A protein has these predicted regions:
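Short conserved loop adjoining the S-adenosyl-L-methionine
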Residues: 105-109
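Class I SAM-dependent methyltransferase SAM/SAH-binding core
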Residues: 48, 56-104
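A short, conserved alpha-helix within the catalytic core of class I
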Residues: 124-134
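C-terminal alpha-helical "lid/dimerization" subdomain adjacent to the S-adenosyl-L-methionine
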Residues: 147-197, 203-205
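Class I SAM-dependent methyltransferase Rossmann-like catalytic core
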Residues: 13-27
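N-terminal, positively charged/glycine-rich alpha-helical extensions of SAM-dependent methyltransferases
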Residues: 1-17
Length: 218
C-alpha cells in the first residue's frame, strides 16, 4: 500500500484535546522501557524530545530519569498548551520545558545528551527534516531513540489495527489513528532514509504489530 500523507500539524483544538486525553500508556511506557533496555548506561543529562506533542512521553521519561532535564519541541500550539498543563500537573516544571519549533528549523536549543522522538516522522512532509534535527540536536555519541507507526500492507489491515487498538475510542481519535497508519513509513523506507542521512549505523527494529524503532548513537 502506498503512503497517504496527512496534515503535518495538529492545529485543531478538539483533535488535540482528544489526543491528549487518550490512553497511550502502553506504547508510551514501552518507549521508555525500550530506551532503558537499549541504553542501560544512561543515567541523566540534557534530553530533547522532537515532536513532543502533549508531552506524555516527555513526562514519563522525566519520571524514569530523575537526573535528566528535558526540552520538548513541537510545531502545534494546541498540543504544546496541553503539554504545558500536563507538565505543571506532574510537578515537573523545573525539569521539563516545552518550546514551539517546527522542523526543519534553523535553530535547535543546544546540544543534548540524548535525543528521543515518538510518532513525529509520519507527520513530516519531508522525512529528512527529522534525521537532520537528530544530527544537530545530539552531542557526539548521544543515545538516539525514535519510534513511530508502521504502515500496514493494506487499508483492511489498517482497519483491523484500529479495531484491535482503538476499540471504544472516540470516532475522532479512531479516524486519526487510521489516517496516521496510512501516513506511516515501512521499515525498509526508514532504512533508506537513514542511509541517505548518514545514519546507516543506526538499527531499525519492528517492536509491535504497529511500531518500529530506530536506535543507536549520534
Amino acid at each position: 500500500m502506498e503512503r497517504i500523507a496527512e496534515p503535518e500539524l495538529m492545529q485543531d483544538w478538539d483533535q488535540a484535546r482528544a489526543y491528549a486525553l487518550a490512553d497511550f500508556s502502553e506504547p508510551h511506557e514501552a518507549f521508555v522501557h525500550h530506551f532503558q533496555r537499549l541504553f542501560p548506561a544512561f543515567a541523566g543529562g540534557r534530553v530533547i524530545d522532537l515532536g513532543c506533542g502533549a508531552a506524555d512521553v516527555t513526562i514519563r521519561f522525566a519520571r524514569a530519569y530523575p537526573d535528566a532535564t528535558l526540552v520538548g519541541v513541537d510545531g502545534a500550539e494546541p498540543m504544546l498548551r496541553l503539554g504545558r498543563e500536563a507538565v505543571a500537573r506532574a510537578g515537573l516544571e523545573s525539569r521539563v520545558v516545552l518550546h514551539r519549533l517546527r522542523l526543519p528549523a534553523d535553530a535547535l536549543p543546544g546540544e543534548h545528551d540524548a535525543v528521543i522522538s515518538n510518532s513525529l516522522l509520519h507527520h513530516l512532509a519531508e522525512p529528512a527534516a527529522l534525521w537532520d534535527a537528530v544530527a544537530r540536536a545530539g552531542c557526539p555519541g548521544a543515545p538516539v531513540l525514535v519510534m513511530d507507526l508502521l504502515r500496514p500492507t493494506s487499508k483492511d489491515e489498517a482497519l483491523a489495527l484500529v479495531g484491535r487498538h482503538a476499540a471504544g475510542a472516540p470516532p475522532l481519535l479512531a479516524r486519526d489513528f487510521f489516517n496516521s497508519l496510512l501516513a506511516a513509513y515501512r521499515p525498509e523506507e526508514v532504512r533508506q532514509q537513514l542511509d541517505t542521512a548518514g545514519f546507516g549505523h543506526l538499527g531499525v527494529d519492528v517492536v509491535s504489530d504497529r511500531h518500529w524503532l530506530v536506535w543507536g548513537h549520534v
